[in-house]
């Protein structure tokens, strides 16, 4: 149930409305609040969400441009070199196929098209396909393009920016201290370095987390603080969908109420930022999915990289039934 609460949600709301950082203890109080406090917490988070984003919901669609064949040993990922999960494997798709995916994103009313590729870092040949596709998409469609291709250096970041990539995603994934328990083939610092290159290039930085990989509540709060310090414009909050054949296959799902508390925490700590309910939304939040949008203002529609999402029409209905509106892409 959680511990009894003496915290004033009004006080925390006032801080967030002024974009003032809450304390570590206030963050812990949110996560450890009695479950009966849930609606009060979500109401407080909604006040902040509405102040900065009204009732708009941003829709994003993922396109898996390269699947499998990844040399990294991330414990959560079915595309990892250490995974035995039966995932589809293919090299970088061509420009025509990537562009066709963008047309599907438009049909789903997405404003952002997210081109994702497995691997440690993109090769120059892979960048050729992606940048050519991005140029065609941005010249012919009312879409913003986000790319998630792995580690970047200055030259590769510059190429993506010049091609028209609006935003680049590179998640911190977990707490700095927990990172070695999740992967050892790259460091937490490697991820921060890529985000620095993204900012320097002029692309909008997108970075988030995966909840449910064995982190503590204090680490979750500190992860929210880390994202505030990074100043990511968009924060995807994933909830682990444990996949058979990966090292984390036996991790329990995050309880829906805990997931909602995490989303509220992210809103309070990063009040002016896009908070996106991302991978594992359907699997972990289940019937409480609609409540997530009282804290978050963004979702993915359709499938994820190697797991299924729900029907796009279902997401549209959730937004409509809440009295919210789909945000149109503003180019």
Swiss-Prot record:
Signal peptide: none annotated. NCBIfam families: bioB. One of its GO terms (molecular function) is iron ion binding. The keyword Iron applies. HAMAP family: BioB (MF_01694). Pfam families: BATS, Radical_SAM. The gene is bioB. It catalyses: (4R,5S)-dethiobiotin + (sulfur carrier)-SH + 2 reduced [2Fe-2S]-[ferredoxin] + 2 S-adenosyl-L-methionine = (sulfur carrier)-H + biotin + 2 5'-deoxyadenosine + 2 L-methionine + 2 oxidized [2Fe-2S]-[ferredoxin]. Keywords: 2Fe-2S, 4Fe-4S, Biotin biosynthesis, Iron, Iron-sulfur, Metal-binding, S-adenosyl-L-methionine, Transferase. One of its GO terms (biological process) is biotin biosynthetic process. It comes from Bacillus pumilus (strain SAFR-032). Catalyzes the conversion of dethiobiotin (DTB) to biotin by the insertion of a sulfur atom into dethiobiotin via a radical-based mechanism. Its cofactor is [4Fe-4S] cluster; [2Fe-2S] cluster. Pathway: Cofactor biosynthesis; biotin biosynthesis; biotin from 7,8-diaminononanoate: step 2/2. This is Biotin synthase. PROSITE patterns: RADICAL_SAM. [2Fe-2S] cluster binds at residues 114, 146, 206, 276.
